[in-house]
Swiss-Prot record:
Keyword Cell inner membrane: yes
Quaternary assembly: F-type ATPases have 2 components, F(1) - the catalytic core - and F(0) - the membrane proton channel. F(1) has five subunits: alpha(3), beta(3), gamma(1), delta(1), epsilon(1). F(0) has three main subunits: a(1), b(2) and c(10-14). The alpha and beta chains form an alternating ring which encloses part of the gamma chain. F(1) is attached to F(0) by a central stalk formed by the gamma and epsilon chains, while a peripheral stalk is formed by the delta and b chains.
Record's protein name: ATP synthase subunit delta
Organism per entry: Desulfatibacillum aliphaticivorans
Alphabetic keyword roster: ATP synthesis, Cell inner membrane, Cell membrane, CF(1), Hydrogen ion transport, Ion transport, Membrane, Transport
Length: 183
């Protein structure tokens, strides 16, 4: 919980700079690229963030990677600041928070839809426009297939979950029957 608060603070700080200089989207792309680099090379992340190794050596390694990656001066300074403050290990969470805040700034909501069967483009568009009306934002949908739902769909947007699946209806019916037997 504390790490999430810290991540939000650092993400918000970079986003404010991005709003000010109009480079918020550039910083987003650079953070995502650097975060992906760490995910693809866990040994690199460990070498940079593990306090067992000498700080000067880790910082030199980070500087070298930052210079070779060609990120903007602001992102480079930001990554070095994260290192200096001992927060470079939170880069993935910070990047995630930054993306959420940047989407909010642009009026974009991200949603996911799981369906038991493949959805037609027309159905996906109806869901997207319905969620757009509900939220008042442009909705970016991620669609997946989950046969375990039996039928219907489950939609998640932010903290809101709209579950219209047959599986959930059957589970609810089962619980209702159990309660009526207990009486």
């Amino acid at each position: 919980m504390k790490n999430l608060k810290v991540a939000r603070r650092y993400a918000k700080a970079l986003l404010l700079i991005g709003k000010e200089d109009g480079q918020a989207e550039v910083y987003r792309e650079e953070l995502e690229a650097f975060s992906s680099l760490f995910k693809a090379n866990p040994d690199l992340e460990a070498a940079i963030s593990n306090p067992i190794y000498e700080a000067k050596g880790r910082q030199a390694l980070l500087r070298s990677v930052v210079e070779k990656s060609g990120v903007s001066a602001v992102t480079a300074s930001y990554l070095l600041l994260l290192f200096d403050k001992g927060r470079i290990g939170f880069l993935d969470v910070i990047t995630s928070e930054y993306k959420e805040m940047a989407d909010e700034l642009k009026g974009i909501a991200r949603a996911s839809v799981s369906a038991a069967t493949e959805l037609s483009n027309e159905t996906i568009e109806k869901i997207r426009s319905g969620l757009g009306r509900l939220t008042g934002k442009e909705v970016v949908l991620t669609v997946s297939q989950d046969p375990a739902l039996i039928g219907g769909i489950v939609t998640k947007i932010g903290d809101l979950v709209l579950d219209g699946s047959i599986r959930t209806q059957l589970l609810n019916l089962k619980e209702t029957l159990k309660r009526s037997e207990a009486v």
